[in-house]
Curated annotation (Swiss-Prot):
Bias type Polar residues, positions: 211-221, 555-567
Alphabetic keyword roster: 4Fe-4S, Iron, Iron-sulfur, Metal-binding
A GO BP entry: iron-sulfur cluster assembly
Organism: Phaeosphaeria nodorum (strain SN15 / ATCC MYA-4574 / FGSC 10173) (Glume blotch fungus)
Residues binding [4Fe-4S] cluster 1, per UniProt: C20, C62, C65, C68
Protein's name in the database: Cytosolic Fe-S cluster assembly factor NAR1
Amino acid sequence: MSAILSADDLNDFISPGVACIKPIETLPAKPEDSSNPYEVTTEDKAAASQPPPPASISLTDCLACSGCVTSAEAVLVSLQSHSEVLTTLDTYRSLRAPWQTQNGTNGTNGTNGTTNGHSTNGTTTNGINGHSHEGKLFVASVSPQSRASIAAVFNVSEAEAGNMIAQLLSGPSGLKTGGHQGSDFTWVLDTNVVREACLVAAADEVANALSPETSNPSTKPGSEGAIDTTPKQPILTSACPGWICYAEKTHPYILPHLSRLKSPQALTGTLIKSVLSQQYNIPPSQIWHVAIMPCFDKKLEASRSELTSSAWLPNHDATQDPVRDVDCVITARELLHLASARGINFASLPRTPLSASERTPFPDPKLDAFLFPHTRRKNQDVVAGSSGGYLYHILQTYQAQNPGSSISVSRGRNADVVEYSLVRGSETIIRAARFYGFRNIQNLVRRLKPAKASRLPGGKTGVSRKPGAAAGGDVKDYAYVEVMACPGGCTNGGGQVKITEVEEVRAYEGVESTNGDTLAPKPGPKEQKEWLAKVDEAYFSGSDSEEEKVDQDGDQNMQDATTNGHTSEPDIVNGISRRKINDVVAHWSHLTGVDTQKLLYTSYRKVESDVGKKQSDMERVAGLAVTVGGGW
């Protein structure tokens, strides 16, 4: 959503609707002094004599407008920035993990009786001064799209960019070198690892929805989008917050089609908060999680009331304020501001991974092996797209279950509409599609809109032109549709380093352009397309570089288990073992005592517009701006 609401990209520009109230929410200009001080002028005449100022609507206006997004959400977005990261690090001391070796003992401090993270009185101390309430446990998660943006700017590989980010957040020459507390992040996680669980769960969700035995309770009034309902065909991806915001506010009939699966960002936050708070008896509020994402809309996702501790915390006290699973979201551009504010030259950071001796093991051994594997699986092939590869993994899963089948790919009306079919001979096993960009999303939701009932007695329903009569057939024949708000996918997110900023960043960091990589002073559409291709190249580069295959401890670090849908182990698809993922999820559920449904899935709801409502309702919505949390 963020990347397209601008006049620079008219192909996907959405003009304000008739309900847009932003142009009239401006104060009248100060009237000029009248030459006749005794002249009486009515208010209407005074307003009519002054030309109205030109209406200018920006993305910030849209986020702050109660006609689409509540003002509370605009406040929540503004609070999430690199400044908040620095303020939090400077305010709270990093909690020393109680399971670390201290004073020659393993997780036990002889002065306060703390053993394995638990004190004798049931409270956790930090193993240093016994005042855990004065500190926080800092955790960061990084998306591959953000790493690709950084890689393109600094002419490094995606893996090297990830190492530089980890060195900034956790390394000896990173954030800990400045600030009042010397705090840094205990763990830096790769969301690609958690995405594997999302891909497996997405394939299972589609299989369950298409099963003839599945009863779909989502058709009951009021249950649309509920966590315990099965989505209707076609199932629509729910990992893009810009798309979800649009659907909830403008097209509630889409809610039964939305996947109930959490995004990798949300799932990572749930895993971090639920495991650490339960294992070491510390409240979720003492675990501070920042996510580095390619999109500004991810800040809104982090603010959803459904993605808080109240959704999974056993015996949650309703009188207590819930804690977000993701406390703050910053983008790739804001990450560079973070380093600059600390006086750190990002380009000079080591491009090698943190050694095993510098990394704190995750408290649970099985989850530690899952989150920090010895082998790092690269991003999927180009055909899978740059938005996580949900659709393609589902197709590959069905392909593995149907030997002799093949995936047919055909382009739609433009490059951001692609149709997929899994065929075996003349039989079509499953159909799916990809719709990127709001221009194409509008076509999709229009074709999914239910036909209006005839007002004439005995009249037929839908006798007019069907919404799905456009080229490409009926979208209801698709089993799954991957929907992303940004044209080109997540590598083109609004939070990525823009082409107009690249040379400025390189000059500031002292990075020289190589191989004719110098960008034009005023890049046009052609240069923007070439830059996005460079970011995509970094995203898909994976393990092409030999030096990335071995870390500082000599471990092989960049190998794939498999790259096709057919292996000797039937449950392995594109290097992801369904059996292993399900085992990890079951272990996570057992460890925390939380049902897997609450851990993996979420819900969606229709959001009413505040335009045209009485003043008391407007005041009620405005009051949400002072609360912590809140949904769309």
